[in-house]
């Protein structure tokens, strides 16, 4: 991109330097030959010369006449030495073409003295220079010169754009505010800086939006345009050609001087000090080059110089035209479809403004300029590089609306943030800055709460209650008493299962458990201790088997048969002393002491060969039923003497059985059997004993149906049991089998049935079949 800027700088360097190509004073013959080589129509004999010395002031009519008339029309020119005649610029136009709608200055509005001031250049060239300006434009153009220097500096285009626009703003402010600047000075300054005004003022919003993209894509665009326009090859060829021609010219001049005798010493140009011909003082190589530069060129040299100038200018204009087309198309493709057109307008707008100001000289300049430079003098050829008026207005409107929308969005966001969070003077959110706002402490604020307090707050809803365990009464153990540590650990083991009834919700189950926890928290002597079992069966053919004991070996698989349906489920085995083993997959415990709740269905079993005595039994009924007529049940079960029932305690719902010869069993005393009917018509069988070896196979036979499952054993001496909402047991070791015996506890749920109960009682007694009578109308016991 810097190469593009350099190219534009070379194209318009005559506007910033008073005499970029100094032409020495030469003879009229040489000048005429020089001009005829460049201009075929130039007359052979004319007194017109390019002079550097000031000439007498001539009128505008004379200047125009000398440039336009032919040799045959020269005698008709009238000279006005003292008077000045105003000429209408419109009558001098050769190409009457409409100007671009983007041109701010029309040809008719140009200053009338502009042509005269341009024609009265001291060096004979129509060049506008900063040095020829008055005090106002000269002093205010310092920033503009700095802006031209910024073009060649190595920096990003974003920074270059910012600095150039800053320099231009300072310069235009100086021209507008300086009282020494008149209208003509301001008009000239605006013409020269019209491209910068378009970039920094008119289309400022568009360039602000696209300059970042221009900077990102400039490297790729420059490489592609250099290849397309062959700029590097052109400049390299001209450099080599110029150096080669200079070397040849120096050698030819030395040889010609030695051959003609103009140089006394043919090798004088190689010596540091040598005398010139005719006794003139001479120097070395540098003096010879200086003399060659000062010597008037011959007609052949002048013709070759003009030819070289035309060729170089032609190539330069061709590259400029190619680069303008290339950067416009490449940047339009990459940057929002308009960046290339905007840049092209910045480059060519000063040319268009100059064409409109110097419209009277465009035909003359067109005759001197090569064909490839036609767009510099012809407004029609320049139009292809300019932006369309409609597109220019649309870009202004589009970017103005875009900026306005962004401003509205930012304002709306600021208002929302201001209402949500107050800000201090630095824009930092301060939620506690305003006193009227109530500060809200974050639960994760470590400065307010410690980690321990956070943990307690998180689990504050999961409250626990102390587990109450009844005292040890009437318990005889054949094993040593557990240690204090084992006893304390065993009290925390909870092996009570709370089945999920199909018709009951979790809240109802929890409420039921809470009501029963206070009534059945402690039992009679020997309650919830020793070896035993708990068998429950659901109405849908599923159940869980649970057994707890403190002494004895409680491990294995429990098989039981019920009265109706098939019940299979996985149980759990645990204990404190010689306890069984089992794997727990998931346990959700709701603590309660001494309560069992069973699922719907019924389960029954006979305890025999269990190494336990039934001399001292306790029978408990819970739920909607009661423990009425328990004596009748036992009397009917034995067929002989009815056992004596004695309450185990005042607050207990169990009874102690004084019985002798009631069935056959081996083992120690102190077994307690609990039989409960839940409020939802569900039942659960639980048996616990204090001593005995409950190992081996237990078989429980019933009248109809089978109930089998992997059982569970847990507990310790005088240990209460809690309610488990869900227990999944993976495995348990050992097989337990119950065989029927006398004095069997029987329970019927509301959803189950008591089929073949006579057969159960007959198998239990071995003799007479007792008569079954309902205890009450609402009761399910017999």
UniProtKB/Swiss-Prot annotation:
Give start-end positions of Low complexity composition bias: 520-532, 548-566, 573-612, 662-672, 688-722
* Residue ranges of the region described as Disordered: 513-726
The yes or no answer to whether the keyword Glycoprotein is present is yes
Say which domain of life the source belongs to: Eukaryota
Q: Does the keyword Signal apply?
A: yes
Q: By its UniProt entry, which Pfam families does this protein fall under?
A: CPG4
Q: Where is the signal peptide?
A: 1-18
Which keywords belong to this entry?
Glycoprotein, Proteoglycan, Signal
Sugar-modified residues: 76, 208, 462, 468, 474, 503, 559, 691, 699, 701, 704, 708, 714, 721, 743
- Output the PANTHER family linked to this UniProt entry: CHONDROITIN PROTEOGLYCAN 4 (PTHR37442:SF2), F18A1.7 PROTEIN-RELATED (PTHR37442)
- What name is this protein filed under? Chondroitin proteoglycan 4
Q: What is the native source organism of this protein?
A: Caenorhabditis elegans
The taxonomy runs:
Eukaryota, Metazoa, Ecdysozoa, Nematoda, Chromadorea
